């Protein structure tokens, strides 16, 4: 991450908020209800980078990168989901940042390497 320097040569930490990357696994009735599209839309509104995809076990996986406040707002959205979804749980963890600068819907991820849309 680029750092801006003050006149004394020290970094000005107030100019850049360090990014974090969070991973969520959402379980419940979350496939076939517009969950990925809604999540992508909300993440883009929040200015987050990352992706969302369906998993073979019926869950949805999200990885999002940005500041902690906006990531928390996305998690709150994930806990409710779009109309028609029934969220039973949202498990989250921090993962390494990637420096991505967009949010996308990724192809479905199924164990064994098979990918579908």
Curated annotation (Swiss-Prot):
The gene is acyP. Keywords: Hydrolase. It catalyses: an acyl phosphate + H2O = a carboxylate + phosphate + H(+). This is Acylphosphatase. GO terms for molecular function: acylphosphatase activity. Coiled coil: none annotated. It comes from Synechococcus sp. (strain RCC307). The keyword Hydrolase applies. Its EC number is 3.6.1.7.
